[in-house]
Amino acid sequence: MSTETDVLVLGGAGVDTIVYVPELPLPFADSYMVPRIEMRAGQTGDFVALGLSALGLRTHHLDMIGADHAGDLIRALHRDRGIPLTEVPLPGGTKRAVNLVGPDGRRLSLYDDSRSHEADRLPEETVRALAAVSRHAHVSITYPCAFALPLLREAGLTVSTDLHNWDGTNPYHEPFAHEADVVFVSTTALADPERTMRQIAERGRARVVVATAGAEGAYLLADGEITHVPVVTPPAPVIDSNGAGDAFASGFLLGWLSGEPAARCARYGAIAGAFACTVPATGTDSIGRDALLARLAELDAAAAGAGA
């Protein structure tokens, strides 16, 4: 099959309003003076697309976007970064969120759930046409991407997804968890991460499950075994954790689509995620392939020296 796209990213296009707050959780008060409030394009699908493209993978983004100013910001972001964007009209308006960012880089995200409607769909003919020329699909959990999963399977694509802060029981996430070959999930809301990881693999198609754990690194389930993925020291001070999970997924997929072992892919992801933590919430910079591979070589050399 001839392909012109390495990764087709579905969903996750939106705009965030970034509010820097003095602390999290934010104590109740009638008002606060904050350093600044800024709006910028970039939610999970956008960041994965940006990360993949920066790593040299041919990337195409498909999602529903509104005919509004927020939608214009998304269109401009993709145009400026040279990432093809196929947009389907979203009658309820472009997806939006407010991110409260604390001094330590942690964030609290508030998502506007009024934008999507039950009848929203990505047209089957559009999904099929883009899938026919793609190697792999990364599917965001935003509505209505779940309806596209069978079409991607019919096209023979491998699939990845990020369940974010799934609690392991919410049924909304299950189609994504069970239809993907590579599953990313945060440990934040999981009572028993190992149990959830194994259930994902047992009940679905996943060959690899990665549970990211912030400053603790990540956990990788591959070939029936769970191993710890050490955190990578960021190349600069940590400013904001926003987008770190998306960067991890992008780095991992670079390795996976290159045929690297899962453990090696996870190192790619850890390096990309560490870089993302040094980027302000208002920014959209991603690590490039050369920088990632150079950092990987440094880590390999350090490990070899320690074992000598």
Enumerate the language-model features and the residues they cover:
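Short acidic/glycine-enriched loop/turn segments that link adjacent beta-strands
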Residues: 92-95
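Conserved phosphate-binding/catalytic region of the ribokinase-like
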Residues: 1-7, 33, 197-308
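Ribokinase/PfkB-type carbohydrate-kinase core domain
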Residues: 1-15, 77-89, 100-228, 303-308
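Short, glycine/acidic-enriched capping/hinge loops at junctions between secondary-structure elements
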Residues: 18-23, 72-73, 149-150
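A glycine-rich beta-to-alpha transition motif near the start of alpha/beta enzyme domains, typified by
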Residues: 58-86
